[in-house]
Amino acid sequence: MNECIVIKCGGSMLERLDSTFFHCIEKLKRKYRIVIVHGGGPDIDKILKKLQIPIEKKHGLRVTSQEVMEVVQMVLCGSTNKNLVQNFQRYGLPAIGISGCDGKLLQAKPLNKKIGYVGEVSKVESSLLEGVLNLNYIPIIAPIGIGEEQVYNINADIAAAGIAAALRVKELIFITDVDGLLYEGKLVKKTDEIEILDMIEKEIITGGMIPKVQAALVALRMGIQSVSIVNGTKNFIGLTGEWIGTTVTRGRLQYE
């Protein structure tokens, strides 16, 4: 049986995924069983603005009232998820769209009451995913979690890391709009969590790259062996199957 990998697509990337991305997925499908986790921030913001519901974020997380939660669930589990499923199938990639609520796939508990109905993964029903994967489908997951009495908005990075850990995958891939981490103008092909923390402290890593590498560090601490940050608008698979981007591991490496 092929190894499994988890791929996280940020909400800001979904409308930019074109034939290049899907051809990469086609290549990966020959070697791996694939799980996709997606975000949907821009789509959610668009509906919130139309409904004149305030948008508030703290430390990169969406403050989620009951009113906001209803919109988040409607958008992520509805049009955002189904549009992505349609795009996969348009390229001949068999896909099934599901939310974390379905079959209690993503069980969640509240992260911090100050930010409302935002959750963290407490358990993943991995047998459900294994069943879908064994049927040769690509599960495309909307990161909504289910608690004892409430559904929760789960950050897509954290959901992807939780799913990757539950499936015991070796690799987690973050699809972004940048080539990876740059150091002195050159792409850092391989690095590790110690070097990442050092580069943040020295302000080598700044701006929008910080949350990307922080998400990678969280995933590594959950037991994933390596996390790669790649550019979804370009071919991100090398001739020998390596990732074209930045791969972060738990071991000690030197800059490459």
Curated annotation (Swiss-Prot):
Catalysed reaction per UniProt?
A: N-acetyl-L-glutamate + ATP = N-acetyl-L-glutamyl 5-phosphate + ADP
Q: What does this protein do?
A: Catalyzes the ATP-dependent phosphorylation of N-acetyl-L-glutamate.
Instruction: Give me the residues that bind substrate, please.
Output: 40-41, 62, 153
**The species this protein was found in:** Bacillus cytotoxicus (strain DSM 22905 / CIP 110041 / 391-98 / NVH 391-98)
Which family does the entry's similarity section mention? Belongs to the acetylglutamate kinase family. ArgB subfamily.
Q: MF terms per GO, please?
A: acetylglutamate kinase activity; ATP binding
Biological processes per GO annotation: arginine biosynthetic process via ornithine; L-arginine biosynthetic process
Q: What superkingdom does the record give? A: Bacteria
List site positions: Transition state stabilizer. 8, 212
Question: Which Cys-Cys disulphide bridges does the record give?
Answer: none
Chief localisation class: cytoplasm
Associated pathway: Amino-acid biosynthesis; L-arginine biosynthesis; N(2)-acetyl-L-ornithine from L-glutamate: step 2/4
List keywords of the entry alphabetically.
Amino-acid biosynthesis, Arginine biosynthesis, ATP-binding, Cytoplasm, Kinase, Nucleotide-binding, Transferase
Q: Name one GO cellular component term.
A: cytoplasm
Record-given protein name? Acetylglutamate kinase
User: Where, per UniProt, does this protein localize?
Assistant: Cytoplasm
Q: What is its EC number?
A: 2.7.2.8
